[in-house]
């Protein structure tokens, strides 16, 4: 029989001070509004992009939706950096959200690559392919943040 090692102690997502700052700042509400709004725009845009790719129709609508999604992504990244500064004392790469921030830069890079493709007149298929790659990374990144939200809720329940 193998000896078992004790489980590593659970590292809480927020200290009490960080939780208090998180709960007190308006940037938490801003993120709470922007995140579902961005997801809604993503879902609509994904449908428009897929429609365009399937039918060849609706390029302008798909393009407009990708531009709106990209604007929201940039906005949530800036406001999220401000939120991290308020809560953790640094604009990005706070230990609690390090990997989410790293992956966010990949998401931003792909959205920016889409803008490059659009503004340099690359073929529409390439533009939409880049948009789909950006959207795939966005879904993974959103999942990372949803996981952290779940962890924070579990931490709160354990603290009560």
Curated annotation (Swiss-Prot):
InterPro entries: BCHF (IPR009905). It is an enzyme of class 4 (lyase). Its EC number is 4.2.1.-. Keywords: Bacteriochlorophyll biosynthesis, Chlorophyll biosynthesis, Lyase, Photosynthesis. Transmembrane segments: none annotated. One of its GO terms (biological process) is photosynthesis, dark reaction. GO terms for molecular function: hydro-lyase activity. Pathway: Porphyrin-containing compound metabolism; bacteriochlorophyll biosynthesis (light-independent). NCBIfam families: BchF. This is 2-vinyl bacteriochlorophyllide hydratase. It comes from Cereibacter sphaeroides (strain ATCC 17023 / DSM 158 / JCM 6121 / CCUG 31486 / LMG 2827 / NBRC 12203 / NCIMB 8253 / ATH 2.4.1.). The lineage of its organism: Bacteria, Pseudomonadati, Pseudomonadota, Alphaproteobacteria, Rhodobacterales.
């Amino acid at each position: 029989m193998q000896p078992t090692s004790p489980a590593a102690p659970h590292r809480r997502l927020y200290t009490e001070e960080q939780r208090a700052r998180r709960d007190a700042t308006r940037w938490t509400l801003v993120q709470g509004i922007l995140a579902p709004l961005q997801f809604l725009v993503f879902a609509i845009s994904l449908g428009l992009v897929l429609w365009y790719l399937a039918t060849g129709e609706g390029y302008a609508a798909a393009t407009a939706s990708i531009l709106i999604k990209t604007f929201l992504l940039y906005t949530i990244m800036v406001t999220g950096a401000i939120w991290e500064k308020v809560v953790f004392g640094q604009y990005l790469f706070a230990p609690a959200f390090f990997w989410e921030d790293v992956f966010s830069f990949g998401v931003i890079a792909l959205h920016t690559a889409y803008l490059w493709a659009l503004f340099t007149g690359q073929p529409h298929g390439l533009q939409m392919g880049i948009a789909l790659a950006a959207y795939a990374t966005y879904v993974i990144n959103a999942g990372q943040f949803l996981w952290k939200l779940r962890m924070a809720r579990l931490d709160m329940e354990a603290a009560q």
